[in-house]
C-alpha cells in the first residue's frame, strides 16, 4: 500500500510542475509575439520616416555636466530627424560602446527610449572630435552668444543648407562652448531673445536650433528630390 500512497501523493506535485512549465512556455511565446509585433511596427515607422531624415547632419554635445541632459538632446535629435549625435565626454560618464549606452537606464529614461533608435558616438576630447569631423569633411557651427573676432549670426539669418556636411555644437550647461571648438568653427550661432532672461538650458537650446536646421535641410532635400524625379520622368 505504501508505494501506491507515495505515487498518489507525488501526482499533484508533478501536475503542478507541469502546469508551471507550460505557463512559462506560454508567457515566453506571448513575449516573443509581442516583440515580433514591436519590431514589425518599428520597421514600418522607420520606412515611413526614412525620406524625412537629415543626412550628413550631426549634433555635438561638448562635455555636458549632467548625463540626463544628454538624454534630452538625444530625444530632440531623434524627433527632429538629425542623423547622429556626438558627445565629447572628458569625464568618461558614458560607456564607449553604443550598445552599452542604449542599456544605460538614465539615458533611456530621459530620452524616452530615443537612445535605442539614435546613433551616438563618444569622444574623449574636443580635439579628438574635431579631428574626426574634419577628416570626414564636416563643417562645424557652434551655438554661442556673440564672440569677438568670429563670424556671428542670429539663428534666423543662417542658411543651413550651404554645407553638405554639417556639425552643430552645443556647449556645457554652465561654461558654454570651449575656445577650441570656437576656433575650429565656421560660424557662431545665437538664438534671438527678447526678455529679461537671456539664456536657455541645453535641452531647450538644442530643440530650437535643431528645429530650424532640420526644417531648412529637409526642405532642401525635398526640393532636390522633386527635381531629380522630374529629371527621371523626362529621360524615361
Language-model region placement:
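Extended, non-globular alpha-helical segments
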Residues: 11-54
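RNA substrate-binding interface of SAM-dependent RNA methyltransferases
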Residues: 39-150, 214, 226-229, 233-234
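A structural motif corresponding to the C-terminal end of an alpha-helix
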Residues: 129, 133-136, 177-187
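Short Gly/Pro-enriched loop/turn and capping motifs at secondary-structure junctions
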Residues: 146-148, 173-176, 194-196
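Structural alpha-helical scaffold elements that stabilize or flank donor/cofactor-binding regions
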Residues: 161-162, 181
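Structured adenosyl-cofactor binding patch, chiefly the S-adenosyl-L-methionine
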Residues: 179-235
Amino acid at each position: 500500500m505504501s508505494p501506491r500512497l507515495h505515487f498518489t501523493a507525488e501526482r499533484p506535485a508533478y501536475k503542478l510542475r507541469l502546469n508551471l512549465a507550460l505557463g512559462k512556455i506560454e508567457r515566453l511565446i506571448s513575449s516573443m509575439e509581442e516583440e515580433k509585433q514591436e519590431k514589425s511596427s518599428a520597421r514600418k515607422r522607420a520606412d515611413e520616416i526614412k525620406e524625412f531624415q537629415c543626412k550628413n547632419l550631426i549634433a555635438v554635445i561638448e562635455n555636458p555636466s549632467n548625463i540626463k541632459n544628454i538624454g534630452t538632446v538625444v530625444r530632440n535629435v531623434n524627433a527632429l530627424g538629425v542623423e547622429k549625435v556626438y558627445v565629447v565626454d572628458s569625464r568618461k560618464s558614458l560607456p564607449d560602446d553604443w550598445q552599452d549606452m542604449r542599456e544605460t537606464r538614465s539615458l533611456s529614461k530621459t530620452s524616452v527610449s530615443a537612445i535605442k533608435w539614435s546613433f551616438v558616438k563618444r569622444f574623449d576630447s574636443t580635439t579628438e572630435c574635431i579631428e574626426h569631423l574634419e577628416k570626414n569633411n564636416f563643417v562645424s557651427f557652434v551655438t554661442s552668444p556673440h564672440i569677438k573676432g568670429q563670424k556671428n549670426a542670429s539663428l534666423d539669418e543662417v542658411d543651413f543648407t550651404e554645407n553638405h556636411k554639417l556639425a552643430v555644437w552645443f556647449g556645457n550647461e554652465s561654461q558654454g562652448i570651449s575656445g577650441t571648438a570656437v576656433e575650429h568653427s565656421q560660424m557662431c550661432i545665437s538664438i534671438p531673445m527678447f526678455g529679461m532672461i537671456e539664456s536657455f538650458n541645453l535641452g531647450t537650446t538644442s530643440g530650437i536650433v535643431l528645429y530650424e536646421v532640420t526644417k531648412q535641410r529637409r526642405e532642401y532635400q525635398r526640393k532636390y528630390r522633386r527635381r531629380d524625379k522630374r529629371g527621371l520622368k523626362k529621360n524615361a
